[in-house]
Amino acid sequence: WGKKSPTFTREGVYVDGESNLHMAMVKKGDDYFSAQLQTGAVVYDLPKDSKGFWPFGKFENPKFMHKFGYYECRCKLPKNNGWHAAFWLQAPGIGSHPDPKYGGVEVDIMENYRQAKEGNIICGCGWGGSEWFGHVAFPYVETEDGWHTYAVDWSEEGYVFYADGKVVSRQMAPKCAVSHVDEFILLTTECHGYNRIFGNESA
């Protein structure tokens, strides 16, 4: 959304021998950094090409884009308070068209920044021109082995969100804006928000 978090890093990431991707918090000096995985980019986040007239960066070919279908992540959530993790979908040209059907909609399948203080996970999507805008909070329930699955079933009619196999929210048109354009996937972590700290400030 216009700028990248200054605490993103390419360090602290590895794949173990069981096909699990690990993202570890990395300390540099007096601050902490963490990584993210994304298969595309928002146009506004690309570094500006100084030779271009318009304030956009050089277009980057996405690694994976798709529209409609079932998207699922199996994960363990961060153990440190203040460490924000999310699984979401985004459109490269979000905000570029007055109708989100053509410009895209941010779809937050799972965000855990309320977990430490409120014991909740949130999901949802929204757009300022729709009747409904915002997120739905649902209780975080620990599993025996610590693994969780978060998912969304995205169709032309809307979105159905799942947590550990259970439906936690249904957001359907016309109350909810529905994207009809290809979007990319993000699995992200942030030690700090863009303009604020999530959870425990010590993290």
Walk through the language-model features, giving the residues of each:
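GH16 jelly-roll
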Residues: 1-203
